[in-house]
From Swiss-Prot:
The modification Phosphoserine is found at S392. Residues 339-374, 422-451, 495-574 are annotated as: Disordered. Residues 364-374, 541-554 have a biased composition (Polar residues). It is found in: Cytoplasm. Keywords: Cytoplasm, Meiosis, Phosphoprotein. Has a role in meiosis. The keyword Cell membrane does not apply. This is Meiotically up-regulated gene 72 protein. GO terms for biological process: meiotic cell cycle. The keyword Transcription regulation does not apply. It comes from Schizosaccharomyces pombe (strain 972 / ATCC 24843).
Length: 574
């Protein structure tokens, strides 16, 4: 190591996430730090290619740390101690102890430990008990981070002045074993170094208030989102029942904060609650806890609800809602870990047989063909639950809540190869769900977003009731079709078929007349009935029959477009 490096502050950042990379990047930009980054996966890529960061404050860059290591154990043999260790790890007491993760690189009486407590309350006690001779600081970074790809992160600031990023550094409680002079020197040095890196650093003697401001939204929204399998926080908060529960949880959280010594002005508390709700509803979805839930990884139960409930018990604050939610959240986490990773959890009322299309049908199952396309889906489970595909009981109907977004089923959610069901019970013999037969939005004469021809033709009053044989031509059922049955062809295919009824049948290689690239079954002595097409009344204005052809005389025009102003002026001039 050169003399220049020995004069720099030795910084170690532990954590393979955006906050860890952002802090190390800004400290290295101060030109006063030698940065070491612990990156568990893709360690060689970080060292060779770097990390791409796009910031709304500092612009876009590709940054490489001075040293990269996959584990802390590889740095234990270093002769030079670290001055600051930024701990940006997930806090999972049921999986590992936070102090053991950094124990080998902490020098007693020298290293200052800086813990990321953004949205976390009460996590510093473990480090303070494990390292009594080392100062333990906490920092809160309210900015928003999002991962856009492998080793690619985006940073957006929420400060009042969007041209700067603010980080709050402070103490939770005074440490008796650390001299005040040493503690003040470490805080001042860190503050000046962050300022040199372009980050505004505010020191707070009591940082719990900022921790509660950033953590109340997490502990009120994320557990409910996971328990209800709903990643869309805005959709969940739109329901009055959930909004009432969330408001009650926020009241209990702020009562704990006030009992802990954090002062909130009563007239500004409602404004703060609205700000927290709006910020949570604006977060990208799915949230990071929900991503862990989908991947069957351990959830931060202690961070979101465990530590706040412990503080409430110590202070004698009654929090029945948080205690109930903690019990449900912990049970959900344990059940999620027992499920093998990669195995989807089906809804208890969902029958996988309902997803199958009729035998020989060409279209895919709607649960696979519409994921990520329809904007009417709140989550994957919404696509598979009873609101979409579970058939209603005999003689009954499927209940819908007053605030349900599925009041009007979308035509895009219908399996085009499934036959319509007209039985009184609403079910066909195979128990498949019936297609939506209600009203179709829009003008039926200009409908261009219908899910199928049957959806468009269902608006006709002279339409005969169809049955399960209406798709016989496509799925290969031979001739025994009633007169009212028809093929599920598009409007253009029906028009071509009607005009070419007297012509010879298509060649075997001709695939234009079938929806699923299959020729219709040719019948002898019988012609399938064709339902009249709903012609567009506006098409007569632009009829091309008035133009002359090679072997015929020009027909009398029925109607034409009105002459333009320019043509009228030229005629007058002539």
């Amino acid at each position: 190591m050169s003399e220049e490096d020995t004069s720099k502050l030795r910084i170690l950042s532990v954590g393979s996430n955006a906050i860890s990379a952002f802090i190390s990047w800004r400290l290295s930009e101060s030109k006063a730090c030698h940065t070491t980054l612990i990156w568990r996966n893709r360690c060689e890529s970080v060292l060779s290619e770097g990390i791409r960061i796009r910031s709304s404050v500092f612009g876009s860059t590709k940054w490489k740390p001075d040293v990269v290591a996959p584990t802390v154990e590889q740095l234990a043999m270093n002769s030079e101690p670290f001055d600051y260790i930024f701990v940006c790890l997930k806090i999972l007491p049921s999986v590992y102890n936070l102090d053991t993760a950094i124990k080998e690189v902490v020098t007693p009486g020298h290293t200052c430990i800086v813990l990321n407590t953004t949205g976390i309350v009460g996590a510093e006690k473990e480090l303070q008990h494990a390292f009594p001779n080392n100062p333990v600081l906490s920092f809160v970074l309210p900015d928003q981070f999002a991962q856009r790809g492998p080793l690619q992160f985006e940073h957006t600031t929420f400060a009042a002045d969007s041209a700067k990023s603010v980080i709050y550094v402070g103490l939770t409680e005074e440490e008796d074993d650390v001299p005040d002079s040493v503690q003040d020197a470490m805080i001042e040095t860190l503050t000046l170094t962050l300022e040199a890196g372009g980050v505004s650093c505010d020191f707070l003697s009591k940082i719990q208030k900022k921790q509660w401001e950033t953590g109340v939204g997490h502990m009120c929204f994320y557990p409910l989102s996971i328990i209800n399998d709903e990643p869309n926080l805005a959709l969940m908060y739109r329901l009055k029942s959930f909004a009432k529960v969330i408001d009650g949880l926020m009241d209990e959280a702020f009562s704990i904060a006030q009992a802990q010594g954090c002062e909130f002005e009563p007239e500004k508390l409602d404004v703060l609650k609205r700000h927290i709700v709006n910020r949570m509803l604006a977060t990208p979805r799915p949230s990071y806890p929900y991503q862990d839930y989908i991947a069957h990884r351990p959830l931060e139960v202690a961070v979101l609800l465990g530590y706040p409930v412990e503080i409430a018990k110590e202070l004698g604050v009654s929090v029945p809602r948080m205690e109930t939610l903690l019990a449900l959240f912990d049970a959900k986490n344990k059940r999620n870990l027992t499920v093998r990773a990669g195995t989807p959890q089906s809804s208890p009322n969902f029958n996988p047989a309902m997803r199958r299309s009729p035998v020989g049908a060409a279209s895919r199952s709607p649960s696979r063909s519409t994921i990520g396309i329809s904007n009417r889906i709140g989550s994957v489970d919404d696509l598979l639950n009873t609101r979409q595909f579970t058939s209603s009981p005999i003689g009954g109907s499927m209940p819908k809540g007053p605030n349900s977004i599925y009041k009007i089923p979308s035509a895009s959610m219908v399996n085009l190869s499934s036959p319509l069901v007209t039985s009184p019970s609403g079910l066909n013999p195979t128990g498949r769900p019936s297609r939506f037969g209600g009203r179709v939005r829009g003008n039926p004469l200009t409908m261009n977003k219908a899910g199928s021809v049957s959806d468009l033709l269902s608006t006709s009053t002279n339409m005969a009731s169809s049955d399960a044989l209406e798709t016989a031509s496509m799925i290969g059922v031979p001739s025994a079709m009633p007169p009212n049955s028809f093929d599920m062809l598009t409007l253009t295919q029906r028009r071509n078929r009607r005009n070419n009824q007297s012509s010879s049948p298509p060649a075997p290689s001709d695939r234009r007349y079938t929806m699923g690239a299959r020729r219709p079954v040719q019948t002898r002595g019988m012609t399938d009935s064709v339902i009249p097409i709903l012609e567009d009344p506006m098409s007569t204005l632009y009829d091309t029959s008035r133009y002359p052809t090679r072997n015929s005389k020009p027909a009398t025009p029925k109607a034409s477009r009105p002459p333009s102003i320019a043509s009228t002026v030229h005629r007058r001039m002539d």
